[in-house]
Amino acid sequence: ESPVQVRRIAALDRGNGPRGGGDVELESFDNYLQEMVKGLGARVIPHMITGVENRQNMPFLKYGDGKGAQYDLVAIAAGVNSNIIKMLGDVPGDYLPPKTTRGYICEFRSTREEILRVLGRAVHVFLLDIPRFEFAAIIPKGPFATVVMVGEDLDQDLVHAFLNDPVVQRVLPTNSVPCVCSCAPLINLGARKRPYGNRVVMVGDSGVTRLYKDGIGAAFRTGKAAATCAVFHGVSSADFEKYFWPTCRNITNDNRVGKVMFATNAIMKNSRFSRRAMLRMAQKEQKNKTSYPHMSTLLWNMFTGSAPYLEMFRGTLRPGFIYKLAVSLGASLWPGRKQINKREEMA
């Protein structure tokens, strides 16, 4: 439940959406954005890019039909799963792809009524004591339920361990709902080099993005910074260093705090007592609407990306948070207390 009693999550489809989802009434988010920018004057050229070269200190794009064109500036707004990432070795600056890990996404299809009955209108987030498991979420989208997983060296064994966990089965009995499509996309964990060169700049997932969070938010911020630099200052590597990189650096520094927070979360979720304390603290906050929802706000922001990691970390240093967490930890350790189920879901 949102700690501020408002709905702030929009569940949407990328590209063509799930396999077999052609009858879904909403258009894809990608198409919506493309049509919007076309209405603002952008020109869409439907060419497949098969190569990126540096000719006479200018970027040259090779097309699938054998032709190509030279450009004053090339902004790469592709994801880390795009083939164009592998074509950038010849661009100035010796671009290296970001560090990545694999996630897992699976679409389960039922009926709109059944998904609403089982999942309601809430995103369900799971913190389970499974080796190599970081976190997962189940998101209702009309007749579909989207399962998103993040973990270390994620493989089919880890996927099956999560889907067959009793806590997950209580929320979504995956054995009785067909999985219509799945994929294991790469996730950006951080840039290995500066995401720019002379007349070439990477925005969004191909460059710097927020750790485990919405790519479009970081793409907007870095895209705006790149456009501002190009229009008002220039397109050289030095220009991007001075006017574009500070935005990327802020995201990178915030991600360092995020890594610390996720490492702390991994330690706490693997302890039965700390899991109980987190759950008890969040439950008490949900019941008592007059007190500040410290844990609820932290969990909400951690898994929705509604706040920077630095802001979340500062929230954990508030006396109220520390006091309530200490009380909840003490209650979890107190013998004879009513036990919360051994495996908890944090949703």
Give the predicted meaning of each segment.
Residues 1-32:
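A conserved beta-strand/loop capping segment in the N-terminal third of enzymes
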Residues 28, 32, 79, 218-225:
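Short amphipathic alpha-helical face segments that pack within enzyme cores
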Residues 36-173, 209:
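Predominantly flavin-linked oxidoreductase catalytic cores and closely associated redox partners
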Residues 51, 68, 153-230, 235-238:
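FAD/FMN-dependent oxidoreductases across multiple families
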Residues 129-133, 139-161, 167-190, 197-198, ...:
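Mobile, glycine/GP-rich and aromatic-enriched active-site lid/loop segments adjacent to catalytic centers
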Residues 231-347:
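C-terminal helical "tail/cap" subdomain of flavin- and related membrane-associated enzymes
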